[in-house]
Amino acid sequence: MDTKHLIASEIQKVVPDMEQSTILSLLETPKNSSMGDLAFPAFSLAKTLRKAPQIIASDIAEQIKSDQFEKVEAVGPYVNFFLDKAAISSQVLKQVLSDGSAYATQNIGEGRNVAIDMSSPNIAKPFSIGHLRSTVIGDSLANIFDKIGYHPVKINHLGDWGKQFGMLIVAYKKWGNEEAVRAHPIDELLKLYVRINAEAETDPSVDEEAREWFRKLEANDPEATELWQWFRDESLLEFNRLYDQMNVTFDSYNGEAFYNDKMDEVLELLESKNLLVESKGAQVVNLEKYGIEHPALIKKSDGATLYITRDLAAALYRKRTYDFAKSIYVVGNEQSAHFKQLKAVLKEMDYDWSDDMTHVPFGLVTKGGAKLSTRKGNVILLEPTVAEAINRAASQIEAKNPNLADKDKVAQAVGVGAIKFYDLKTDRTNGYDFDLEAMVSFEGETGPYVQYAHARIQSILRKANFSPSNSDNYSLNDVESWEIIKLIQDFPRIIVRAADNFEPSIIAKFAINLAQCFNKYYAHTRILDEDAEISSRLALCYATATVLKESLRLLGVDAPNEM
């Protein structure tokens, strides 16, 4: 139990009619440590208890008896709590040393499934930095939900269907070279895609020709299907090589095409529930009662189905297959209206489980303030970017520690981790400007900074030949170690908050804070001095390293023992 919950439960024993959540929301951290570690203002109880806040505070302070507190005192209308730092430090350190990497593991999910729609790059287009956010946010959320007892199901809903394949087929038939595509599939397909889009801007017939080829593809035309399958196979090989490098795995690669034969059922269900309305020859579902102005366009006048029809089929399939407790879609902010429509249509179909579906939006990655666009050829490709990040990490490692073993492996962990961490430390709904130099820096709020703090602690533990033991009586009450203890004690709650808000940045910011606190402690403390507290200081180091490593793991980032 963290200190806030400990205090809230003690106050509730004295004031049982007050909800613990209310008490928690009222607790304050005094500006001056001489006023205690936490304070409870009694103003809100004055009306119900019909007493002055000062008297209420005094009554509460007198009735609280716990060996977790050095003292509890009333100062005016406030109850000030002074925690027994030595006792709490000992408890926290023993818990982490006992649990190891399992520290802060919880069973909130009770093994229930969480379906996570993530990554979902478009076939025949390069894997760009734009796809990175969905990939790393989804992967981190999977780790976070797993940590609190859910079973994550990671779904790569590949963009392997749509009019863009009509465009690509037209481009390939006009200018394509089979040998060139086989040698460098993604590069060549991107060139074709950019070229055909440029031509379409001045020649309207290109769009019509692309639509015709896509209609052929929907009708299983052999030539169209063969080209589509080839584009898909080549792209997947490329993507999987990158996923391996990023250490990201999936449970399903069922993309848009997988649902081609599952959309008729959606149309039949909508018709049977009398939800389809004709509008200008198209079939729509009105959603005004949900405050959604524009109806959901289910089927166009030419008979072509739409993105939402496919997503309805996917939602039904996932509920039947995984019986999810939560289904989350890690997709950009720009798709918010689409997901509101998707949930509303399912609600209209009387599927109350649609309440368990959540769009987890995120902001854009820009470069020099400019939006990235594959269509316009303004794109940062992930593969060369990762390679450059690894090279930059290798250069810094060479300068810091030229005799390091496994330099290449460490550089890989630092370079890849730097890109992931920089993305995940940003509040999800905000965008960020891509800056590789800032990402790979060992200074500031970066992945390498946190990794280096972990490696520094491992070096201390190796020098001391420390092995964790629960038999020792650890006791620390200095200011710097107490700041670390409070953070470590808070880690279980931090993980739950990250899950509740679908927000990995909460973990990333926690890791930065913990690394900063340790570095401050390291600068002020002679950790290896042979005195009565050495085992306690080393236990604190071990616990800090354990929690730093686990924080990084939840973000999908490795923590090397040496850098």
From Swiss-Prot:
Motif 'HIGH' region: list the residue ranges.
121-131
List cellular component terms (GO).
cytoplasm
What compartments host this protein? Cytoplasm
GO molecular function terms noted in the UniProt entry: arginine-tRNA ligase activity; ATP binding
Keyword Lipid metabolism included in the entry's annotation: no
Q: Is the Nucleotide-binding keyword given for this protein?
A: yes
- Keywords on record: Aminoacyl-tRNA synthetase, ATP-binding, Cytoplasm, Ligase, Nucleotide-binding, Protein biosynthesis
Q: Among the record's GO biological process terms, what is one?
A: arginyl-tRNA aminoacylation
Q: Which reaction does this enzyme catalyse, per its entry?
A: tRNA(Arg) + L-arginine + ATP = L-arginyl-tRNA(Arg) + AMP + diphosphate
For the protein in the UniProt heading, the enzyme class is ligase
Q: What is its EC number?
A: 6.1.1.19
Domain of life, per lineage: Bacteria
- Cite the record's note on assembly: Monomer.
Q: Tell me the protein family, please.
A: Belongs to the class-I aminoacyl-tRNA synthetase family.
Q: What is the designated name of this protein?
A: Arginine--tRNA ligase
Q: Which organism is it from?
A: Streptococcus agalactiae serotype V (strain ATCC BAA-611 / 2603 V/R)
From the broadest rank down, the organism's phylogenetic lineage runs: Bacteria, Bacillati, Bacillota, Bacilli, Lactobacillales
